[in-house]
Structures are given as C-alpha cells and as structure tokens.
Amino acid sequence: MDFFSQKKQSTPLPARIYQEGENGAVGQRTREMRLVKDRLLELSDQLRAPLAMNRRQFLQSSCGLAAAFLAMNSVFGPLFAVNPAEAADPEESAARNRFLKEQLIFDVQTHFVYPDYPATNILGLRRLAKRWNPDLQGRQTPEDIHFDNFYREVFLESETDLAVLSSAPNDDPEQWFLHNEDLARAREKVKEKSGKKQLYSHAVFTPGRPGWMDDLEKAIALRPDAWKGYTVGQPIGESQWPWRLDDEKLVYPAYEKMMKAGITTVCIHKGLLPSNYKKRMAGTWKYGRVDDVGQAARDWPQLNFLIYHSGIRTGGVPGREEIRIFEESGEIAWVSDLARIPEKFGVDNVYAELGSVFAVSAVSAPRYCSGILGTLIKGMGEDKILWGTDSVWYGSPQWQIEALRRLKMPEDLQRKFGFQSLGSASGNLKNRIFAENAQQVYPFPSI
C-alpha cells in the first residue's frame, strides 16, 4: 500500500484552546470550558484591535495562544506561566519563541493509519480535541489521520524534532492502525524526506495469537527501534488474546528473543480504557492494570518497560469524583500504582509515558494534570518520565508542547503531597521530559 502521496495543506498555529463540542456538550467540565471560552473571546476582542487583526487572525497567532493561557488562568487559577505582554505585543511573543527555539522535543508516541483503514471511530478523538484546537474545527475526514497529515502536523506545524511511530493491534487484522512492515516503511520515508533519522518505529507483538512467535521473528528482521504490546489484546473492545507481562510461560520466551536481538525497549499500552470498560471489556479490562509490570521488570532488568499513557485507568476528561479523590488523598487511579512500582519492586527500568493522559487533562483540569506529573515524578524519578502526545489523534502537538512548557505545580500541592516544582519552560526538569529521558531508551541519531 502507498500511504505517502502528498497534498498541500494550510498550517495555522493552534491558538483557541477550548471550543464547544457537538450540541454544546463537553462532558463533565462544561462549565469551566465555557467560562474559558467566554474569557478568551473577551480578551481577543480587547487585544486584537490595536494589532489590526480580526478575531480569527488573533486567535491563530502566538498572541492568541498566550491569551488562551491567560483565559485558563482566570478560570482555573494561576496554573500556567504566561506574561500578559505576550498576548498584547507580538514582539514579546516572538522573543519567547526565539528563546525556546533550540529546545529539543522528542515525542515517543505518534500515530497514523493506512489509507484503507475501515473504522472511523478513531476520528472521535479529533472531534474531542476540537474543543481546544481550532485547527480541528469542521468535519473530520479519514485523510486527517493518514500519512500526509501526520507528517504535516507533527514535523511541520510543531516544534517536534524526533518522534516514534506506534500502532495498535486488533483481533481483525484489517483494523490494525499499521502493520509492522508499514511502520518500518514510514520510518524510512521520513528519513528520505528530511535527510536524517527523524522518525523511529515500533513493531507490535501479540502474545497468544496464532503464529505470534513467528511474527516476532519477522519483526526482528525489520530492526524496529522498540516493541509495542497491548496486554488487553486490543485497545477498545474485548479481545480473544489478553495477556500479562509477567506470564513466564507465554511471554518470557519473547523477552529472551528481544534481548538477543538487541531491541530492549518494550512499550506497553496500559489503562486508557473507555468509560464503560466494565461492560464493554468485561473479560479483559483487568489486563489493562499495571499489576504485572513490577515482576516483569524485576525479572528482566536488561529490558526497559515504557508504560504508555502512564497507566491511567480511563481515557476521558477527568471527572469530579476522580478529582475529589486526588485532592483528598493524592491517589490517581492506576497512575499512583505505577508510581509505586520502582520502590515496591526495587527496579529502575520502568518509565511513564504521557500520551493522551497529558492531552486530555492539561486543558480540562490542569491542576489535576499537575498532580499526575507530581505523582509520577515523586514515585519514579524525574529521569523516568517521557514526552508523548498521541498525535495525530489530537491534531498538531504544538498546543501540548506549549501547555507543558507553561504548566506549574501549585504550591499547596507541593506542601500537601511533597511534589516538586515543575520549573521553567526550558528548565532541567522539562528538558528531561521533552527529550533527554528518551535518549536513555532511544539513542539519538548521529545526524
């Protein structure tokens, strides 16, 4: 299949962080989102006139992006570092952009699907994201999640320097996002376009499926940069083939092959279940927990286990009850379990990846998002957190990059739970998360 034909696309910078969803419904954070939207429109009308911009031009500018964070601060409290001058003066905004231009960004989770991919439900994520990303307004089409748009949104419309292309299996082979051969081809195609290694690729392994060990051998020949596995069998809906990381009989022989092949980074989708997971995945949801990570990591210290989505239990906007529990106890379902693994099992080869868990919480419940980061950093160490965006499901990752650069740790959470400050946009901690930690598991290219 040829998924590399190019189209000319427009490239506006995401600016408007919130937008009402279909029929005005935006889930459990509706009131806050509407307040942010109203404040942003008010700010834009105040600030755009001296700049001789219409509303759309302003919201798609760097000043508009700064105004969006000011609007969020007005609703959620001072959770994002933003100078009001950035929203009023293009030179102030440009100066900040120049200062951060050299910051390295390594996104360890990106996606697209092959052209004939039959399911359209994945477009629902882009429909969700259009609440905060204006580039996604209007009808979403299958082409939006194909290679052309992937390359444009990740490498041209954002400051992402390096990325990892991943995939997901399905019991129906036609519904894999990409097969392993496609992943390898995409890596080489991007290298041809850029003249250097800019895209890394996974190979998916599927314990328990007929012929899966033979497929693993074939994948080794493709020389993937890392492995990707789904212990629930497939991300949505029940699979015939769930499995556990610590299954000595089924999975440990595969680890042996991985180790001998010298491909020792094992990425595992955990959590991110649908809200009705106990019904929709009644027989398999328990395999999405992180209770099998510690033993496998202890038994295989030669391997690095990267837990994608940080194991967060569900993938939706954080609900009031989840936020209440966190504020009272510091617990975040399954994320806290993951954060306890290094101390509980005495391991240092477990990492937390931020794809989707950051995207969904940063702009809908930023204080809770800070709590997720604080929990992971405290339990796992600041050298074990990896930047991932799950793009192109949410459009260009630039808005996520800006959100992490600006996100702050509330002082009361630092006192109550012992969380550390997140530091400045280009401070040591955020530089580690954005790229330096990834170098431990994905060697940087020499050119």
State the predicted function of each range:
Residues M1-M53:
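N-terminal secretory signal peptides
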Residues D45-M53, N73-T110:
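C-terminal segment of N-terminal export signals and the immediately downstream linker at the start
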Residues F106-T110, A163-L165, L199-A203, W227-G229, ...:
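Hydrophobic faces of well-ordered beta-strands that scaffold small-molecule active sites
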Residues R152-E159, N180-K196, L216-P224, E256-K260, ...:
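Acidic (Asp/Glu)-rich catalytic clusters
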